[in-house]
Amino acid sequence: MDVGELLSFKPEQTPKRPSDFDRPDDDEDDDGGSPGPKARPQQRAQKVRRTEQDTHVRSKPVLPAKEPQISEQERLDILKFVETEEPDGEVLDESGLKKMLLLFEKRVLKNQEMRIKFPDNAEKFMESEIELNDAIQELHAVATVPDLYPLLVELNGVASLLELLSHQNADISVAVVDLLQELTDVDILHESLEGAETLIEALRNQQAAGLLVQNLERLQETVKEEADGVHNTLAIFENLIEIRPEIAKEVAEQGLLQWILKRLRAKLPFDANKLYCSEILSILVQDSNENRIMLGTIDGIDVLLQQLAAYKRHDPNSAEEQEFMENLFNTLCSALMARENRDKFLKGEGLQLMNLMLREKKLSRNGSLKVLDHAMSGPDGRDNCNKFVDILGLRTIFPLFMKTPKRNKNRLLGTDEHEEHIVSIIASMLHNCKGSQRQRLLAKFTENDFEKIERLMELHRKYLDKVEAMDREIDQQMRTEDDDEQDDDAIYVKRLSGGLFTLQLVDYIILEVSCTDVVKQRVLKILNLHHGSMKTIRHVMREYAGNLGDASDSDWREQEQAHILQLIDRF
């Protein structure tokens, strides 16, 4: 009986403890069967002894066949023992780590010797392999003391572990991966800055990423233990990138990006590892332009489009698969921030796929809208904008402009976010389309008695109200805080997220479509009807021009500012 069972057992409340051999004629009806929960409660209260024949405890805890009752003095003795006894596993110190690593190295060498001596006789080296695995398991104790990581590195423990990733027995490499995953756990690394820095640098210097990817190549995910090894390997990469974001570029260059694409293409059922691959892929490209370009050069855009094509007419089968789909959309959006990938997206018929998804009204509609926004924005989106008009994309986008779909549990895109993407796409087309494509676009705003102008002005009023409410909130905060604490950039960002960004896009569209007198007169009529002002639109657009872009592309910024100011003067 262990200590927990002894302490949790509650003896029957009787005047005195019965003798073990009291009432020897106790009945033995239970021939090996456990009594039910309602079996003879009165007798249970009286019969607390047990004989050799009656080994079944008549109480709720199912205990071993030993004396179930203890006296109060015995209980106190047990408590005293538990409180004073030293724990089995003492806190690891430097001396303990040195002994542990020495034993580990001995077992590595012994296993190598036995494998060389008996290469074709597994029975001969199997015992040494089991001992090696046990030594690896013992090293998990190091993860509880991250301050010892520098000593672990100094004694070449990390190098020895990484060498075992190429061990002939995949079980050994999986055990090493499991250990490395625990050693690099983010919460543990945060406990010791020096330990984290030392361990991460050692892993980088030893080209750990490349070794881990090589091990991934040989793991068979049809074997549960090896599938777990794949999952833990991905966790190691996630841990390292979270601590050192610049590592994302290194691990991609050492083969992780290519392996993930290969894993996504594999004809395997959807599982946790495929989901995790999509998460790591999204992380790799979200902040690294080098990784975005690399993704395009190894046909990553085509792989993403092929994977997403499965959801053009069918929704994901589970919440996990929906998360997988969203990760792919996010990855594609990040990839399209690289100029080189816009053309690959166009040639891969990404526009046609996104347009089809918008028409099908499945869960993929949300992601496709964001992808189109990224593909068509800025000067690099010119070809995609013109092509979108050519494939009759206007027939798809304007119904969504006229009426925002209602949000429900399956349509996770909020109203404001949906409208932001729609007006951003239309603004990009007005900016980038030339010739016949632009004429077809402008003609849309005069159809059906200028209904789209009416909708445009409705959005102008909606987001103007939002911005004015945000400005009042900011003014109130400024009155209660010191002026020194105010950050103009932070305030502007807050206003953008509060509706100013969408308002700027809406007002930009108003200026672009007001190039003809008939449209301009309709805009003025609606403004007067709702007590609006052209001055408001001009003010919004001047502020937009003043904060346009960044200093990295000064020529583009100057051209855009000149174009917007020209539109303002004409309006």
Q: How would you describe each model-predicted region?
A:
Residues A141-L148, V158, E163, H167-A170, ...:
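Short helix-loop boundary/capping segments at the starts of domains
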Residues K124-E138, N169-S192, N205-E242, A252-E253, ...:
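Alpha-helical solenoid repeats of the armadillo/HEAT superfamily
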Residues D147, E197-T198, P245, N289:
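Leucine-rich repeat
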Residues F118-F125, V145, L151-L152, G157-L162, ...:
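HEAT/HEAT-like alpha-solenoid repeats
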